[in-house]
Amino acid sequence: MGENRKTLGELGFAAHVNVAVTGVTIDNRLVKRGDLFAALPGTNVHGARFAMDAIAAGAAAILTDPDGAAVLKSDLDPDFPIVVTSDVRAALSRAAALFFGTQPETMVAVTGTNGKTSVASFCRQIWNELELSAISIGTTGVEGDWTYPLHHTTPDPITLHSILAQAAQSGVTHGAMEASSHGLDQRRLEGVALKAAGFTNFTQDHLDYHHSFEDYFAAKSRLFEKLLPMDATAVINTDDPKLSIYASDLAMLGYTLITIGTNAANDLYISDQRFDATGQTLRFSFKGKTYVKRLNLIGGFQAENVLMAAALVIASGSDPQHVFDTLEHLTTVRGRMQYAATRKNGASVFVDYAHTPDAVETAISAFRPHVMGRLIAIIGAGGDRDTTKRPLMGRAAVETADHVIVTDDNPRTEDPASIRAMVMAGATDAANITEVGDRAEAILRAVHMLEPGDGLLITGKGHETGQIVGQDILPFDDVEQASVAVAALDGMI
């Protein structure tokens, strides 16, 4: 592929000098000659402070906001191309989309506190079963017919639009992506042409960033009110009371909706679920027609994730019957109610990414119908993150599991014992809770407790393969550790 070259006008900007740029970057250390350097406001310092370094490295133009322009006023040559806009993050995202120029023709996005990764993965899997080339983008990276590792659930807009362009150029026609509240608030999804968007649920998380439920919901709702075209479809899970109201609001605004849930008033609703040790059988209806399908997935909540994905795929143009026929072939996302090991006595171990109070309660409650005996849960909370959810996680766990072990998650720069104490504080009156700091030891102890018919759910880290302690990432995989513990205790090693 030849050099990509676009004028500022072609990127949607009006500048006093309509120069051409050959790249877009937000990092002055990565500037190449001919780049557009986007000087964004930061938490501690404005990116405009580094604009002169970017120019010295060869930047052909600067994109910034009024505050950035004020920083540059005394240093910048008045003839140098500069674009000043009030919402610089949104402008950057749209410019990145225009610069890279293409994306899979069918894109959907899903937001919500929990379930985003599973829904995006299920969309991709359904499309693949329908013999369509597809990817999913989110917490577990870019997966499917074109792959790429990611460091954020919703990547920065330059990375995102580069990924979408490369995927499209490789033949990918369909894409499903997670839309995190951070990504939405920071305008990273602007420029993605959506056919449909889904809202799974809304509970407490990320209040360290958004500060209030109102701000958190406003970030989530941006996906529909700002990014979703009016001719596209919103898929809303109305089992969540707040989302039931929100669905009505969107309908009044003129949006096309597919509502899902367990209420027969929904377009797509679950009427019955039967659980067994390896999955569930689902009875559901869509617009007057009833279906019975097998899901080889653990956890009742996965049924709603599957139907959310099915609705998004239907909303983006696929035949409902063909979509529903694929459901028995779906597999779980790494780290989402993922099978880890089985003891010789038949007791099973699963791993889940649940790391919020609601997710912990949901995961344990969903695992319960698959367990004949005691349900043991391991929980922990991450350091340098929302502290208010820690005692709530402890309370949620002791109220839903038969025994709980509190251990370290990713303590980061916090004192691990202090984090555990905050989790334990939510269950001070409970007798079914134990504290074991070392995560490997906690898993070993929990596996040792398992009797015939019992089940162990290890929550918090899911697909992660490292534990963040201080500034270091130490190798640690919950699935691998559970397998090792079972093998050791059952005399297989």
Per-segment meaning from a language model:
Residues 40-45, 333, 360-361, 365-428, ...:
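Active-site beta-alpha connecting loops in nucleotide-dependent enzymes
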Residues 60, 195, 402:
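Receiver (REC) domain switch/active-site residues of two-component response regulators
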Residues 82-87, 434-437, 442:
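Short acidic-hydrophobic, aromatic-tinged amphipathic segments that line or gate anion-handling sites
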Residues 1-94, 98, 241, 269-274, ...:
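N-terminal leader/targeting and accessory segments in enzymes
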Residues 207, 474-493:
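Short, flexible loop segments at boundaries between secondary-structure elements
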